[in-house]
Regions:
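Amphipathic alpha-helical packing segments from all-alpha helical-bundle domains
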Residues: 126-132
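GST-like domain detector, emphasizing the conserved glutathione-binding G-site
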Residues: 1-126
């Protein structure tokens, strides 16, 4: 059985949906971002990046949404989550998933996590206002 570490309202939702879609046997473990659990030693032992999603499998630990989605699709080929028989089409799916994670998702990160970039409370507020 796999274990998915996630936080609500995060990009981990895509991995959660994929696992449900294929009927995978997994346990979902909430990482409490409100209490900085992602920065605690227990979670950092699992994922030193301190991010979600993290998928613990019998083969090892995977992080990053595109990697997890590709792994799930390849582990459950009959679910048809991705065009596994066509390398180019599969790469197009990977490109789209990477764009969502590295561009679209990140473009909104400043609203909720301005402290990653600046320490000045006024600058954090300005980033939040810019995102509205």
């Amino acid at each position: 059985m796999w274990t998915l570490y996630y936080a609500p309202i995060s990009c981990a939702l895509a991995s959660h949906i994929a696992l449900e879609q294929v009927g995978a046997s997994y346990e979902a473990v909430k990482v409490d971002f409100a209490n900085d659990a992602q920065r605690g030693p227990e979670y950092l032992r699992i994922n030193p990046k301190g991010r979600v999603p993290t998928l613990v499998t019998e083969r090892g630990i995977l992080t990053e949404t595109p990697a997890i989605l590709a792994f799930v699709a390849q582990s459950f080929p009959r679910a048809n989550l991705a065009p596994l028989d066509d390398p180019y089409a599969f790469a197009e799916v990977q490109a789209f998933n990477s764009y969502l994670c590295s561009t679209v998702h990140v473009a909104h990160a400043h609203r909720m996590r301005g402290h990653r970039w600046v320490d000045d409370p006024a600058a954090i507020l300005a980033m939040q206002e810019k995102g509205e």
